A protein has these predicted regions:
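Aromatic- and Gly/Pro-enriched helix-to-coil junctions and flexible linker segments
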Residues: 15-151
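Positively charged n-region of N-terminal signal peptides that target proteins for export
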Residues: 1-4
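Bacterial N-terminal signal peptides
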Residues: 6-16
Length: 151
């Protein structure tokens, strides 16, 4: 996807949820620069990060509920009766999530959108704030992956 098309998609999405006037240039630029698939560990993603998208949290829908259609982070839908993704679907999810990650950056959208503002998150994410602290175990797992660690 050309960089200008990714920026246009990010702006259109922000406008759709009523935040176009406040979308920062940094967020638009981040949308235009997808991470390289060679920089973040696929196996860590598949085994540790991807299950987070299926986890039910009190007061919130599972990430997959909204992120399987109509959002910039588009995960593969799970067929009825299945509770995990197959290898092909996991690779597609990995590629989709790379679009919201800048390897080594704590400002990656994957980290800041679902994090409470008072914990360092931003005001985006119409699905609510899933983590109130950067000390949350799930958020720490996401951070570990984004920072390039495999532990």
């Amino acid at each position: 996807m050309p960089n200008w098309l990714a920026v246009l998609l990010a702006l259109a999405t922000a406008w759709r949820i009523g935040t176009a006037s406040t979308m920062s240039a940094a967020t638009a630029q981040q949308a235009a620069v997808p991470a390289s698939s060679s920089t973040l560990d696929y196996e860590f993603f598949k085994m540790r990060v991807q299950p987070i998208f299926l986890t039910k949290r009190p007061g919130h829908a599972r990430c997959i509920s909204c992120h399987s259609s109509g959002t910039p982070l588009r995960l593969q839908p799970l067929p009825p009766g299945r509770t995990v993704w197959n290898e092909e679907e996991s690779h597609k999810n990995y590629d989709a999530v790379l679009r919201v990650v800048v390897p080594g950056s704590l400002k990656s959208r994957l980290l800041v959108h679902p994090l409470a503002e008072e914990a360092g998150g931003d005001f985006y994410h119409s699905g609510g704030k899933h983590w109130s602290s950067q000390n949350d175990a799930e958020w720490q797992t996401l951070k570990t992956w984004v920072m390039g660690s495999q532990q």
